[in-house]
From Swiss-Prot:
GO BP, one annotated term: cytosolic ribosome assembly
HAMAP family: eIF_6 (MF_00032)
Family to which this protein belongs: Belongs to the eIF-6 family.
Organism: Picrophilus torridus (strain ATCC 700027 / DSM 9790 / JCM 10055 / NBRC 100828 / KAW 2/3)
Annotated keywords: Initiation factor, Protein biosynthesis
Gene responsible for this protein: eif6
Name of this protein: Translation initiation factor 6
Alphabetical list of Pfam families matching this protein: eIF-6
Keyword set includes Protein biosynthesis: yes
Function according to Swiss-Prot or TrEMBL: Binds to the 50S ribosomal subunit and prevents its association with the 30S ribosomal subunit to form the 70S initiation complex.
Length: 217
């Protein structure tokens, strides 16, 4: 299932929410109707949380089946939730917007080039996958220009063929380029997807929807 939606009147829904196949995190000030759309489309447990004083849950949190990486002021809000045994790492670093700076699945993680090696190792341990530093089309905030699930990975249309092959080999998944929200290359900020469903910003065109659906469904 693929559906258009906005969060808090924004089409950049990926900065507000984060999902995996079993759990979804949304900001506390989302409406009950918006929450219901996420539950029905993504088919997961849905929790409304805040991370510090921020509602930008998608920007502040990254996860896979093994672990969660979150900004340093967000860990207490997660400990009381049913997160299916995941490890939790809080990042006390200027790059603590984990959702913007990390893209991960159950095979690998790609992280911002400027993470120190000590934090790279901690991320690797918590997510339980090979973790490498890099960028996508020159963008260091890799989580903002990529989105993935078990079926595929969509990255900014500015990524070249060598990058697409590298990402496909790294994440062991089919990778395609595309846009959302009427031409935005920030697909990670515009799309929320797991293996059960896909949500996209309301400005996404029918052509973009087809590409997204073809990649992630």
């Amino acid at each position: 299932m693929i559906k258009k939606v906005s969060i808090l009147n924004s089409n950049f829904i990926g900065v507000y929410a984060r999902t995996w196949n079993d759990v979804t995190f949304l900001p506390v000030n989302i409406s009950d109707e918006e929450k219901r759309i996420f539950e029905e489309t993504l088919k997961t447990e849905v929790y409304k949380i805040s991370i510090g004083n921020s509602f930008l849950i998608g920007s502040m949190l990254s996860m896979n089946s093994n672990g969660i990486v979150v900004a340093d002021h967000g860990i207490d809000n997660l400990k009381s939730l049913n997160i299916n045994g995941r490890n939790i790492l809080s990042i006390n670093n200027k790059l603590n917007a984990a959702g913007n700076n990390i893209i991960a699945n159950d095979h690998a993680a790609l992280i911002h080039k400027s993470f120190p090696d000590s934090i790279r190792k901690k991320i690797e341990d918590v997510l339980g996958v090979e973790t490498v530093k890099g960028s996508i089309a020159g963008i260091k905030t890799v989580g903002s220009v990529a989105v993935l699930n078990d079926r595929g990975m969509l990255v900014t249309s500015e990524a070249d063929e060598d990058e697409i092959k590298y990402l496909s080999d790294l994440f062991k998944i089919n990778v395609k380029t595309g846009t959302a929200n009427f031409g935005s290359n920030y697909v990670g900020a515009s799309i929320i997807a797991n293996s059960n469903g896909i949500l996209v910003g309301e400005a996404t065109t029918s052509i973009e929807l087809g590409r997204i659906d073809d990649t992630l469904s």
